[in-house]
Amino acid sequence: MYDNLKSLGITNPEEIDRYSLRQEANNDILKIYFQKDKGEFFAKSVKFKYPRQRKTVVADGIGQGYKEVQEISPNLRYIIDELDQICQRDRSEVDLKRKILDDLRHLESVVTNKISEIEADLEKLTRK
């Protein structure tokens, strides 16, 4: 799993926290950030440079002229797909944790209100 990332020398893809991608001249710059260890101020990161792929395409659709366009490298596209899988999984785990905590807080509030209601009923019975 994550063969493209492993081919870059990333031995523990599960430690990836996030990534950034920017274009610089004729290159795409991929920067991968790893989870911070306790006591670290900055996350560890690695940077990779990919030349943009050049293609010549028909400029106007009629066949009168051609123009050169640049696209992201196919290898980089595969790497980004793997990074998206990792980062999306982390996001969904965080969302699930948030949902569970919200449900727990709601349950706590319902139980607290029910206890107050029962105590009030008991108080009414003891006054008689």
UniProtKB/Swiss-Prot annotation:
It comes from the Bacteria. Transmembrane segments: none annotated. Pfam families: DUF3461. Belongs to the UPF0325 family. This is UPF0325 protein YaeH. The lineage of its organism: Bacteria, Pseudomonadati, Pseudomonadota, Gammaproteobacteria, Enterobacterales.
